[in-house]
């Protein structure tokens, strides 16, 4: 459900783009695995040419493979770019006015949206690479299958699978898999792994190995590292915090092993320290379950 929410966010960002006609591409069943892209017919791709030798040089338009500089509007037959890939808009397989083009048969974000791998620098307004190895920069966002490197966006950075590296989004940074590294979102940052909760914000969940920073919320199913937010840090039921949580409201619905600092701290199982105006540790003796200023179980 978190993936569907990402799809809806993309639809909102694309308001007014209904003039883009849908063209169905081959489904991407596993964005984390590079698969050969079938040769599409001319109605599903844009024109292309390469200035150089073979696939090395400057690729203009919807080239399949380019080593060097690739300049393009939208992707259809694109498979791989080594170097700098500037693709301004979404693939031909995606009509942003139709949610069905952004979700798969299970209603989760993905579907036909992801095309090609960039090894190097991926640039665009709103682009959907299957994989980024290197740097991704977008106006509305790089929304990728997987990320290995650094991504920066004026709105959102999101991955359908794991986010490995650093992601910074003015609106948010999210992974529908795990976050291994650092994710910073102006509003929220979090991970939504298999078996996680539904929705966004406090209802998202996944595994965070590193640091997540969100203006209103930082969430995960498990956190090994740190969660920081002006609003809430949440670890879902059955999850574990191993490290640090700093926010106004730290809600650890599993086991806390480490330190939480906030106005209100809550832990189902505390094996660490809480510092705040009010501290709740449900596994403590009755007299020590709710304490001001400091609570601990070591």
Language model region names:
Residues 1-7:
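Bacterial N-terminal signal peptides that target proteins for export
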Residues 7-17:
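Bacterial N-terminal signal peptides
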Residues 20-25:
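Boundary at the C-terminal end of the N-terminal hydrophobic targeting segment
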Residues 26-298:
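Surface-exposed, glycine- and small/polar-enriched segments that build interaction surfaces at terminal
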